[in-house]
Each structure stands twice: as C-alpha cells, then as structure tokens.
C-alpha cells in the first residue's frame, strides 16, 4: 500500500489520509507510554495486538448497533476508519476502584463500586488531561448538553457489552477509556465511538488470580506487557491457540472483515 499523507501522530497511533474522501488510515505503533509520555518505551508487537483486539471489539460494537468510526482492518497494523471530528474529551467508565480514582478518594483498589461511574477528562497533554465536569464541558463549548447525553448513553452501552464479553473469557473489566467523535453524514451529525479499545485503554484483571492483563504492567514496571496482551487476544479467540508466545511478532488468526490518560 502506498503511503499517504500523514494527518496526525499521537502517542500510540498515526492517522494517514484515506483512499476515499471521509476516510482515514489508522496505524498502530509499538510505542508504550504512560503519564502523558513521561514514561516511554518501544515494545515489539504491541501495535499488532492492539490493532487486532480493537478491530475485534469495534466489529462487534458495529454489529450490535453501537456506532463507531471503524470500517475494516487493512493489515496487521492498520485500520480503515471514518473521518470524525474528535470531541476533546476522554471518557472513563469505572466499575471497580483502581488507578487515580482509588488514590483520589482513598478507596482500596479492587473495591466494587456501588454503580458504574462515568468521568470526563479534557484532552490536553500539557495539562495532564484534567478531570472536568459537565458544567466545564458545556461552558467551554467542548460538547453540547445533547452530545453529553449521547456520549454517556454510548459509554453505558459499551460498558455493558465489554463487561459481558470479557466475563465470558474469565476477565474482569475494571475500567476503560474511550473517545467519541462527530460523524457528519450530509447535513446530519451523530456521535460515534472512535480511537481504540484495547488493553492500552482498559484495565483488565484475570477473574480468578487478579493478574493484570493491561497497560498497568507497563505503568507499574511489572514486565510481561506483550504476554498479557497476547493472553487477552488468545482468550478472545484472536491468537492461534497452538502458537507459542513470541513478543517480537505474535501470530494472529486472520479474519474476514464484515461489510492515555491517567485513568
């Protein structure tokens, strides 16, 4: 595939001009970052795993009627996506106390929350992505009240789906982060799920051992990041069961595509 014009490069992905108007190519890098890139390493194979896991999840979201920017996977590291106007918010949905919530409120990590909690963070690396309220969001025009309602409704639906998906393979969904975008279709606009959903953006614990299968392994210098991501892919049926782990180049089962926060 010929390289197209680079549109944007973030901490873990690069966006290129797509083959058709209104499309982009999303490339997954091997960079692992934490604390808004204060900690950074290149981890061989991470981008391939995140691309494949995110594809699997977004395909399922599309199938059950949760709108996303995802069109199809192009290769091991790239996806074709719809171009959207990103809402400058990171939406964090929490089911179990962990990370900044546990520290901020003095709650023991692992405590099941009374109900799922949705938090908003303003996307601004220079400010360390500060937590904001709905009042901030509407006052500064980052999103309208109706858009906030739509984002929260999508977040709840995604949480319901992911909780069941991971529970079925012995994984507890502690929390996750998504981004949303405005998708313009003629004169009509709707809010869709964008960015990625992968072990980079979710906290995932083995339901029996509580082993961490997510980016906390990198944040906390635990090691075994790629092996943990491979385990998630294996349980979801993405990795070949008979293939031993190879951190530098995981072997993935191909499929036919259907028609960083401080959290």
Curated annotation (Swiss-Prot):
The keyword Amino-acid biosynthesis does not apply. It comes from Chelativorans sp. (strain BNC1). One of its GO terms (molecular function) is ATP binding. Pathway: Purine metabolism; IMP biosynthesis via de novo pathway; 5-amino-1-(5-phospho-D-ribosyl)imidazole-4-carboxamide from 5-amino-1-(5-phospho-D-ribosyl)imidazole-4-carboxylate: step 1/2. Signal peptide: none annotated. GO terms for biological process: 'de novo' IMP biosynthetic process; cobalamin biosynthetic process. This is Phosphoribosylaminoimidazole-succinocarboxamide synthase. Residues 239-263 are annotated as: Disordered. GO terms for cellular component: cytosol.
């Amino acid at each position: 595939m010929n390289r197209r014009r680079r549109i944007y490069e973030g901490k873990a992905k690069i966006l290129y001009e797509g083959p058709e108007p209104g499309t982009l190519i999303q490339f997954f890098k091997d960079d692992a970052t934490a604390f808004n890139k204060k900690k950074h390493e290149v981890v061989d194979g991470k981008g391939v795993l995140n691309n494949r896991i995110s594809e699997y999840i977004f395909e399922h979201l599309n199938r059950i009627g949760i709108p996303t920017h995802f069109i199809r996977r192009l290769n091991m590291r790239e996806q074709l996506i719809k171009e959207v106007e990103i809402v400058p918010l990171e939406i964090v949905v929490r089911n179990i106390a962990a990370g900044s919530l546990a520290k901020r409120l003095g709650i023991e990590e692992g405590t099941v929350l009374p109900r799922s909690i949705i938090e908003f963070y303003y996307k601004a690396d220079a400010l360390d992505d500060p937590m904001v309220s709905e009042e901030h969001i509407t006052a500064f025009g980052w999103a309208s009240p109706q858009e906030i309602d739509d984002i929260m409704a999508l977040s709840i639906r995604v949480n319901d789906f992911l909780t069941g998906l991971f529970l079925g393979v012995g994984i507890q969904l502690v929390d996750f982060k998504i981004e949303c975008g405005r998708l313009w279709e003629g004169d009509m606009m709707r809010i869709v799920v964008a960015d990625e959903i992968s072990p980079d953006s979710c906290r995932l614990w083995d339901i029996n051992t509580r082993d961490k299968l997510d980016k906390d392994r990198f944040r906390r210098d635990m090691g075994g990041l790629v092996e943990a991501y491979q385990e998630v892919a294996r349980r979801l049926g993405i990795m070949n069961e008979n293939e031993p782990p190879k951190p530098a180049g995981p072997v993935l089962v191909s499929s036919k595509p259907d028609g960083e926060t401080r959290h």
